[in-house]
Amino acid sequence: MRGQQAPPQQPTRVRTPRENENEVLGVIEQMLGASRVRVRCMDGKLRMGRIPGKLKRKIWVREDDVVIVTPWEVQSDEKCDVIWRYTKGQVDWLNKKGYLDFMR
């Protein structure tokens, strides 16, 4: 298998936003530095997101990544926490199922 690429696999399970926990899909528009990002959310709001340390150490978050965010209880229209980042295969699945219609 050396030098050969494995065929793309369908994701077996994709995490979707939990509405009872106030989670929203979003797309990272801009990296601001100091673990902060600007996120365009599916409810039409532009929020400043914070990447928590446990997520920051595990995965890299870049511009145009699709993420799940939770708005803060105070200043919920302005600030949020990034809690999940989707891979390319998961984004394709979300697109097919209609979750990413807000991006169009």
UniProtKB/Swiss-Prot annotation:
Classification via PROSITE patterns:
IF1A, S1_IF1_TYPE
Region entry Disordered, spans? 1-20
- Cite the entry's keywords alphabetically: Initiation factor, Protein biosynthesis
Residue ranges with Low complexity bias = 1-14
One GO MF annotation is:
translation initiation factor activity
Q: Does the keyword Protein biosynthesis apply?
A: yes
InterPro entries per UniProt: NA-bd_OB-fold, RNA-binding_domain_S1_IF1, TIF_eIF-1A, TIF_eIF-1A_CS
Which residues does the UniProt record annotate as the domain S1-like? 12-87
Task: Name the CDD domains for this protein.
Answer: S1_IF1A (cd05793)
PANTHER family, sorted: EIF-1A
Q: What is the annotated role of this protein in its UniProt record?
A: Seems to be required for maximal rate of protein biosynthesis. Enhances ribosome dissociation into subunits and stabilizes the binding of the initiator Met-tRNA(I) to 40 S ribosomal subunits.
Q: Which family does it belong to?
A: Belongs to the eIF-1A family.
Q: What is this protein called?
A: Translation initiation factor 1A
Q: State the species of origin.
A: Methanococcus maripaludis (strain C7 / ATCC BAA-1331)
Write the lineage as a comma-separated list: Archaea, Methanobacteriati, Methanobacteriota, Methanomada group, Methanococci
Q: Which gene encodes it?
A: eIF1A
